[in-house]
Each structure stands twice: as C-alpha cells, then as structure tokens.
Swiss-Prot record:
In brain, may be required for corpus callosum development. This is Protein C10. Pfam families: P_C10 (PF14974). It is found in: Cytoplasm. PANTHER family: PROTEIN C10. GO terms for cellular component: cytoplasm. InterPro entries: P_C10 (IPR026317). GO terms for biological process: post-embryonic development. The modification N-acetylalanine is found at A2. The keyword Nucleotide-binding does not apply. Belongs to the UPF0456 family.
Length: 132
C-alpha cells in the first residue's frame, strides 16, 4: 500500500515542468543566490567539497519548492523528485532541458580532456575526415 505522500507526489509531465521551472527560479532568488555563492566559495571547485557544501544548500532550496507538491521535506523527497524528473527526460525534451539547467546550477562544469591532433583525438579524425 502506497503512502499518502507518495501518491500526492506523483506528477504528470506537465506538472513536473512547472515544478522544475519553480525550482530553477528559486535558485535565482537573492537569498538563495547568496547561499549558493557562499557554498561554491567554500568548495573551491573541489568535487568532495562541492558535495559537502554546495549539494546540501541546493537540496534545501529544492526542498522548499517541492514540499508544496507532496514531496517530503527531506533528502528522500529530493531524490524522489529527481527520479520522477529522470523518468520523464527521455520522453520530453523540455523536461530534459530544464533538468540540465537545474543540474548546471549546482554541479561544477565538467572539463573534457584535451583532444588535439597530437593526441589523435580530433573530431575530424574520429569521423574519418581528412582536413586540408
């Protein structure tokens, strides 16, 4: 038997878009922007410190929004929301885009290893194209 909170947290794809947009908007609220900036400064672009400082703040910001939609106001609620969004990403490009924007707000940019002619990793070479 499903709990009442699990039933009320079931969102349609359209509802998920609305909630995602609200969560993204919450990150731009002045007080939340300050909290995130402070957390990022404390993390110094170190992935371990990002998990320690940035992720908890990002989780709290999300919790403040999603609790109005039936998700529990704890880490489990955020995980359930994330799983729900993930389940819609493949079917709905707008949800995938919003989800990517949300992740970009609290995950550090990933740097790719260099791919130059010296490493044999150029895009043209990988496609079998010869450049003049």
């Amino acid at each position: 038997m499903a709990s009442a909170s699990a039933q009320s947290a079931a969102l349609s794809a359209e509802q998920a878009k609305v909630v995602l947009a609200e969560v993204i908007q919450a990150f731009s609220a002045p007080e939340n922007a300050v909290r995130m900036d402070e957390a990022r400064d404390n993390a110094c672009n170190d992935m371990g410190k990002m998990l320690q400082f940035v992720l908890p703040v990002a989780t709290q910001i999300q919790q403040e929004v999603i609790k109005a939609y039936g998700f529990s106001c704890d880490g489990e609620g955020v995980l359930k929301f994330a799983r729900l969004v993930k389940s819609y990403e493949a079917q709905d490009p707008e949800i995938a885009s919003l989800s990517g924007k949300l992740k970009a707000l609290f995950l550090p940019p990933m740097t790719l290893p260099p791919h130059g002619p010296a490493s044999g990793g150029s895009v043209a070479a990988s496609l079998g194209l010869a450049l003049p």
